[in-house]
Every structure is written in C-alpha cells, then in structure tokens.
C-alpha cells in the first residue's frame, strides 16, 4: 500500500531515493497520515501541510547531525514517521506511546522538546552557537509557523540571531492559519503588503509623478523597484540581519530541495519563507482547518462527525463561555482577552455577541496580562481566558503589572490539572503553587459546573486580582443554576460529615474524595478557595478529627495542601496531616482517568493512601 514509505526507517533511507520519487513519497505519507490520525486522533491539519517540507529537510540535511528544531510541534507527525517511528504511530498520544510533540527522550532526531510556541529560533540559535564554539561543522534549522511568529520571543531571538555570525536557517511555514486566525500587525504585514492599497498607491503615485518627465522613466523604474522592495515581507527580516529568500511553494518538493541545497552552502543567518496550505490533500481539512486542527477519531471517508450527538454534560470551557456572555450583558465594563485560543478557551460565542469587547492578542501571553492591567487601570473589568500552562509565560507581568498594583484583572484558568493526551507541556500542574504565593491574589477552585459558574461570578465582583481554575473536559454533572450569586470569600463548605479523618478537597478532587470517604466514613470539605483559605473551617476539622488529608490536582510542593499545613502550624495545631496531589515529576501523556489513577488521585487511590497512613 505504501511501497516507498514502508522501506524508509530513517532519513538515511530517504536520502537513497532518487528525487523523482519524492512526490510519490509525499503522496504515500499523506495517505498514511490520514489513515493513522483518523484512528488515534491528534493534530491533523498542520501535519498535512508540512509533508513536503519535512521530506525536503531530511533529504537535504544530514539529520540528526544537522539540527532541526520544530516550533510548537503541531506539524511533526511526518517527521516522526520518517525518523523510525512509523510502526508506533498507532500509539500516538496514548500512555507509554508516542508523544504528540517532539521529545528528546523519544528520538535523537527530536533535538529540542516543545509544546509551547515560539521557542524554535532561540533554541536553534543556541545550537548554532554551540557548534561554532566547539568547532563542529553542522547546520541548525528552526521551522516556525502556525501563528508562532506573532510572539515576542520569536522576535527577541531574531534580533539576537541577526547580529551573530552563525549558520542558522529560519524557515517560516506560512499557512496563514494558526489555531485561531492570526491577528495583529505582523500578520497584516506578511499577508497584505504585496496586495495592499498602500503599496499600489505608492507604485501608481511614483509612476505618475515621475511620468511627467519622459527621460526619467528609467529612474521611475528604479524607484518602483525600491518601493516594492521596501514593502515586501522580506524587508522586515533583512532588517534583522537575515538573508531573506522567498516566498516559495511549500508543496513543491523539487523547488524545496533545490532551494535548501543552495541555502545549505550559505554562511550566516538565512531566512526562508515558504507558503503552504493547512490540511493540504484532505479537502475537509483544507476547507475548515480550525475544525481539523486537532481531531478525535474519525472516518476518513466522511470526516469528523457534525454536532455533539446529544445534550450530555457541558465541558467546563462551555460553562465559562456561557458565564462570560451572561456576565457581559450585566456589566458593560467586562472585556474578554485571549492569547490566540478563542476556540480552546470557549470565547467563540462571546466574540460573536460582543465583537467590540473581544480581544485576541495573538500568542503573546506577557502582553495579554499587561494589556489587561492597562484596561483595569482606566475602568474596565478584563477577563483573561488562558490555559493554566500558558499563564506561566506571563508570570512576571502577573506579579509586576497586575498584582503589585492590585488591579481588578480576572484570570479564567482552563486546563488546570492533568490534560491527558497533550502531556506535560500542556498540563496545568503548577498554578496553585505559583498563584497562592502572590500578594493580593484570590484563588478559587470549583468542584463542579454550577460552583464554577458561581465562583466566576464571585471573582468578577472583586476589585482585586483573581483566578478561577478549572479542569479540561466535563465535570460531575451538577445542575447549573442560571441565577448567579457571590459566594462568601475564603469560605469552604462541608459536603459530608464523618469521623476520624477529615479530607480537605480542592476543585476537581472533591468528588473523588467524596467517593473515597464513603468507604472510610470520613468528613469531606469542599474548600473552594485556595487563597484565602478557610482557616476557621480548618481549625474546627483539626480539633475534631485525628487526621487531616488534603487533596488537589496540583503538585504537592507549594500547593493548596502546603497552605493548609502552614495554617495549622500558625494556629499551633499539631494534628497529623497527609498531603495528596501530583508528584514532584512530569506526568506523561495518556488517558486522563488512567493518569489520575497512576497518581493515586482517583477514589481508590485516595482511599488507599489514607488507609496506609492510618495503618502507620
């Protein structure tokens, strides 16, 4: 079925093929990718768009000696297939299977681990400098696209690289399509300058003015050429010190091979601009690349199923999105901000209903936080919808620009806790630890869908920095009350009364704790707030129980349990404690329920840990 692909187990095998067979290989690779991802799910449209580029890179460069650094990793399935992992593609994003992103431990061809965007240029530059310093003759290549060029980190690296005499190649895979449509001045610059009215007017204007004097036609031609050069995409990158080449067709493997061979012999920083189509070769993905960016299992003949197949429980992301729209109707000061995650953060409806109050700042988490701070200074009430793992990228701004000034910015932290198939790069394992130590912050963790809605409302009422963290996927199925009411700040609630053991559960761990408590006859408190903690409730439970257990879907170190321990110590209560949470390690990808079980954070694991502690 795949006569060429089946004989390629490494790039060395690929380089044995005559160039005339590379287009056939691209076709086979595309067919294999459709078949494979349709069975496992995963990133799809970006991978279809990077096939010819991947073939050309491994054909021209001596990988793994030469370094390929992929940005984000959404487009690296073809790379994995060509580097000896074809037979394991059926394990993609499953526990103990292939990771969905490049991972150094997985293959020597994965030169740099990624998952977050805009890191490739800086990493590849570091490798280029290392090669030069150590006297190693090798090339370093950064492949960046999927909206990652909108992030400031990419331009920091470009600025540094252009001033250094290193053999670095940056390839911009320009498919004009990130997860959400690219926004901002840079995308406008790349996408519109060549066809824009301003460029056309400049060209026409210079011709008209200089056309008055016929002998100056030659000068006019040169001026027009100069105007064209000044306003083409390459100008920006040449100003950074790169030799700009392109744009070229990213789906013409012959052109790619010829161009890369020429560039390989050049010295200094090079910038190759290629144009590709996201979803190339699979019409449904070409027509709707957002829908097919990341997919579940599907029938290749019919594509992804339409609709959701019935009512079912809403995901927490939807609970947030509905609350945001409802709250916007009640308070005209509300504005919504997302760093290029409109769909993932549940803001599609909000953008449609309130386009003048919706701000997608592109992949710019640092800017998103400071931007929100500026809005809050002058009377708006910004809500920053962001994944827990991505807020890490704006941590200094969170402290310096928001919390230090005690500004009313609300952070809606999606994907808090483990995220399953996306693995450790996307897990929200640290937010309780890095938020609770910041003065002026109020941190909340709802236990179900209705509590999520009410705590979102509660957070919005405060005129100080707040964060509400909630997990990926669906909750336990609590009935959502449309009427919103602010919950008492820093107060938890006892959900079950038992004896001997009191479990202080936070957020997503409340319901597993309740299930464990049935077997233990333990007390369970839904703490709701990580900061401020309900010190009075902790005191009462400590005075009436023999063991205090804290449970959270966050690392134990510095998390909510640590806060409870600090509170007990401050009150002088020497009650035995047990802190349960994520380990001091990175939890790998896999089914979320399986991962929680392996971490001892399902009902059975919680019960087991408590019984072992009681047994001494």
Curated annotation (Swiss-Prot):
Pfam family, one: Transket_pyr
Any one GO cellular component localisation term in the record: cytosol
Binding site residues for Mg(2+): 146, 175
Coiled-coil region: none
UniProt keyword NAD, yes or no: no
Cofactor field: Mg(2+); thiamine diphosphate
Range of residues in the leader sequence: none
Entry keyword annotation includes Plastid: no
Entry note: cofactor: Binds 1 Mg(2+) ion per subunit. Binds 1 thiamine pyrophosphate per subunit.
Binding, thiamine diphosphate: 74, 115-117, 147-148, 175, 282, 365
Cross-referenced SUPFAM superfamilies: Thiamin diphosphate-binding fold (THDP-binding), TK C-terminal domain-like
InterPro entries according to UniProt: Dxylulose-5-P_synthase, THDP-binding, Transketo_C/PFOR_II, Transketolase-like_Pyr-bd, Transketolase_BS, Transketolase_C, Transketolase_CS
MF-aspect GO terms: 1-deoxy-D-xylulose-5-phosphate synthase activity; magnesium ion binding; thiamine pyrophosphate binding
Top EC category: transferase
Keywords in alphabetical order: Isoprene biosynthesis, Magnesium, Metal-binding, Thiamine biosynthesis, Thiamine pyrophosphate, Transferase
SMART domains per record: Transket_pyr
Catalytic reactions on record: D-glyceraldehyde 3-phosphate + pyruvate + H(+) = 1-deoxy-D-xylulose 5-phosphate + CO2
GO biological process: 1-deoxy-D-xylulose 5-phosphate biosynthetic process; isopentenyl diphosphate biosynthetic process, methylerythritol 4-phosphate pathway; terpenoid biosynthetic process; thiamine biosynthetic process
Enzyme Commission number: 2.2.1.7
Domain of life: Bacteria
Recorded metabolic or biological pathway in which this protein acts: Metabolic intermediate biosynthesis; 1-deoxy-D-xylulose 5-phosphate biosynthesis; 1-deoxy-D-xylulose 5-phosphate from D-glyceraldehyde 3-phosphate and pyruvate: step 1/1
Physiological role: Catalyzes the acyloin condensation reaction between C atoms 2 and 3 of pyruvate and glyceraldehyde 3-phosphate to yield 1-deoxy-D-xylulose-5-phosphate (DXP).
Similarity remark: Belongs to the transketolase family. DXPS subfamily.
Summary of subunit composition and partner proteins: Homodimer.
Protein name: 1-deoxy-D-xylulose-5-phosphate synthase
Source organism of this protein record: Chromobacterium violaceum (strain ATCC 12472 / DSM 30191 / JCM 1249 / CCUG 213 / NBRC 12614 / NCIMB 9131 / NCTC 9757 / MK)
């Amino acid at each position: 079925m795949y006569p060429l692909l089946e004989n390629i187990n490494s790039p060395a095998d690929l380089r044995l093929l005559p160039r005339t067979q590379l287009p056939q290989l691209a076709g086979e690779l595309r067919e294999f990718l459709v078949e494979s991802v349709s069975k496992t799910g995963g990133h799809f449209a970006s991978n279809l768009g990077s096939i010819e580029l991947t073939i050309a890179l491994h054909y021209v460069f001596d990988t793994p000696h030469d370094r390929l650094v992929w940005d984000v990793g959404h487009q690296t399935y073809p790379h994995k297939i060509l580097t000896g992992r074809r037979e394991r593609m059926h394990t993609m994003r499953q526990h103990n299977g292939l990771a969905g992103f490049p991972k150094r431990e997985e293959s020597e061809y994965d030169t740099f681990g990624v998952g977050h965007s805009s890191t490739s240029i800086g990493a590849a530059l570091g490798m280029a400098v290392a090669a030069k310093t150590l006297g190693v003759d090798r090339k370093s290549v950064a492949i960046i696209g999927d909206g990652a060029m909108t992030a400031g980190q990419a331009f920091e690296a470009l600025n540094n690289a252009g001033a250094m005499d290193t053999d670095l190649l940056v390839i911009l895979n320009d498919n004009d399509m990130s997860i959400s449509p690219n926004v901002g001045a840079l995308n406008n610059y790349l996408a519109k300058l060549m066809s824009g009215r301003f460029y056309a007017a400049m060209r026409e204007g210079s011709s008209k003015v200089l056309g008055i004097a016929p002998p100056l036609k030659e000068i006019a031609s040169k001026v027009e050429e100069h105007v064209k050069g000044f306003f083409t995409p390459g100008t920006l990158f040449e100003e950074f010190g790169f030799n700009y080449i392109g744009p070229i067709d990213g789906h013409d493997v012959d052109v790619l091979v010829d161009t890369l061979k020429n560039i390989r012999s050049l010295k200094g920083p090079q910038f190759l601009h290629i144009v590709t189509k996201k979803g190339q070769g699979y019409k449904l993905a070409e027509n709707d690349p957002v829908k097919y960016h990341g997919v579940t299992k599907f029938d290749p003949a019919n594509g992804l199923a339409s609709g959701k197949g019935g009512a079912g429980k809403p995901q927490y992301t939807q609970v947030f999105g509905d609350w945001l729209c409802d709250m916007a109707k009640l308070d005209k000061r509300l504005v919504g901000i997302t760093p290029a995650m409109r769909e993932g953060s549940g803001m599609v409806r909000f953008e449609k209903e309130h386009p003048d109050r919706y701000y997608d700042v592109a992949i710019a988490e640092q800017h998103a936080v400071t931007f929100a701070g500026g809005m809050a200074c002058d009377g708006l009430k910004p809500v920053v919808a962001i994944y827990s793992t991505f807020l890490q990228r704006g941590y200094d701004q969170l402290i310096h620009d928001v919390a230090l000034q005690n500004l009313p910015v609300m952070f809606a932290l999606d994907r808090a806790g483990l995220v399953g198939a996306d693995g450790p790069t996307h897990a929200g394992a640290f937010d309780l630890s890095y938020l609770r130590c910041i003065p002026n912050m109020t941190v909340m963790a709802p236990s179900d869908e209705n509590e999520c809605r009410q705590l979102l409302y509660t957070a919005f009422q405060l005129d100080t920095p707040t964060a509400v963290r909630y997990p990926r996927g669906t909750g336990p199925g609590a009935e959502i009350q449309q009427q919103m009411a602010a919950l008492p700040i820093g107060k938890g609630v006892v959900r079950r009364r038992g004896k001997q053991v009191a479990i202080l559960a936070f957020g997503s761990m409340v319901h597993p704790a309740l299930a464990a408590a049935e077997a233990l006859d333990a007390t369970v408190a839904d703490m709701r707030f990580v900061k401020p903690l309900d010190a009075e409730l902790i005191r009462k439970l400590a005075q009436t129980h023999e063991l205090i257990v804290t449970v959270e879907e966050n690392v134990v170190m510095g998390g909510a349990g640590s806060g409870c321990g600090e509170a007990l110590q401050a009150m002088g209560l020497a009650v035995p404690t047990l802190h349960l949470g994520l380990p001091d390690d990175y939890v790998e990808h896999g089914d979320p329920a399986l991962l929680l079980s392996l971490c001892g954070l399902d009902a059975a694991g919680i019960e087991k840990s408590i019984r072992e502690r009681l047994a001494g």
